[in-house]
Amino acid sequence: MTIKLIVGLGNPGKDYQSNRHNAGFWLCEALAHLYAGNFKKETKFFGEVAQINISGRKVRLLKPTVFMNCSGQSIQSIVNFYQINTNEILIVHDELDIDPGIAKIKFDGGHGGHNGLRDTIQTLGTKAFHRLRIGIGHPGDKSQVTNFVLHAPSKGELEKIQNSLNNSLQIIEDMINGNFDKAIKTLHTKE
C-alpha cells in the first residue's frame, strides 16, 4: 500500500495562512515547492490541487478551500473521482496534544477534538487513513483552544514547528513507498 493523496488541513484565505491551524497547508506547500508542483484551484474538489512525482509515483496534494469543519466534502470528492482508497490517504494536520517541534505519524483513531478530522471521518465513514500530526502545543485551558489555533505561533514556536515540518519532509518518500515502519522510526526518533 502506498500514499496517493496528501491532504493538508487548514482554513482558506490570507487571514488564516499564518495560523497554527494551517500547519497542514504549510507542509503541502513545502512539498509542492520541493517537488515542483503548482497548486491549481479545482472547484469540483472544493480545493487547490497539485500533482507531484515522488520516487516515480504520482501523488496528489490537496488543500481544501472550504473551512476546516467542512474538509470532508473536499476530500470525499477527490477520493471518489480518482478512486483512492482511504488507506492511501495521508492527512496532515495541527495537533494540540503534541509540543511544537514534534511530529507524529498515526493510522486510524479518533478525531481528538479536531474539527477537520471530525468532519473527514464523518464524511468518509471511516477512521482508516494515515495522519501526520504536526505539534503546535496546547494553550493550557480548553476555553482558549479556538483563539490559540486561529492565531500565529510565536517566533520561537514557529521555528520549532518549521523544524518538525522539515523532519516530516525527510520521511515523506518512505511513506509514499509504503515504508511506514521506517518513516515512523525515523520521525519519532527526531524528537
Curated annotation (Swiss-Prot):
Subcellular location: Cytoplasm
MF-aspect GO terms: peptidyl-tRNA hydrolase activity; tRNA binding
Positions annotated as active site in the UniProt record: 21 (proton acceptor)
Coiled coil (residue ranges): none
Site (Discriminates between blocked and unblocked aminoacyl-tRNA): 11
Top EC group: hydrolase
Catalytic activity: an N-acyl-L-alpha-aminoacyl-tRNA + H2O = an N-acyl-L-amino acid + a tRNA + H(+)
Keyword Membrane belongs to the record: no
Family matches, as Pfam families: Pept_tRNA_hydro
CDD domains xrefs: PTH
Keywords: Cytoplasm, Hydrolase, RNA-binding, tRNA-binding
Binding site for tRNA: 16, 67, 69, 115
E.C. number: 3.1.1.29
Residues annotated as site: Stabilizes the basic form of H active site to accept a proton: 94
GO-annotated biological processes: protein quality control for misfolded or incompletely synthesized proteins; rescue of stalled ribosome
GO cellular component: a single term: cytoplasm
Physiological role: Hydrolyzes ribosome-free peptidyl-tRNAs (with 1 or more amino acids incorporated), which drop off the ribosome during protein synthesis, or as a result of ribosome stalling. Catalyzes the release of premature peptidyl moieties from peptidyl-tRNA molecules trapped in stalled 50S ribosomal subunits, and thus maintains levels of free tRNAs and 50S ribosomes.
SUBUNIT field: Monomer.
Family to which this protein belongs: Belongs to the PTH family.
HAMAP family found in the cross-reference section: Pept_tRNA_hydro_bact
Identification of the protein by name: Peptidyl-tRNA hydrolase
Organism: Ruthia magnifica subsp. Calyptogena magnifica
Gene behind this protein: pth
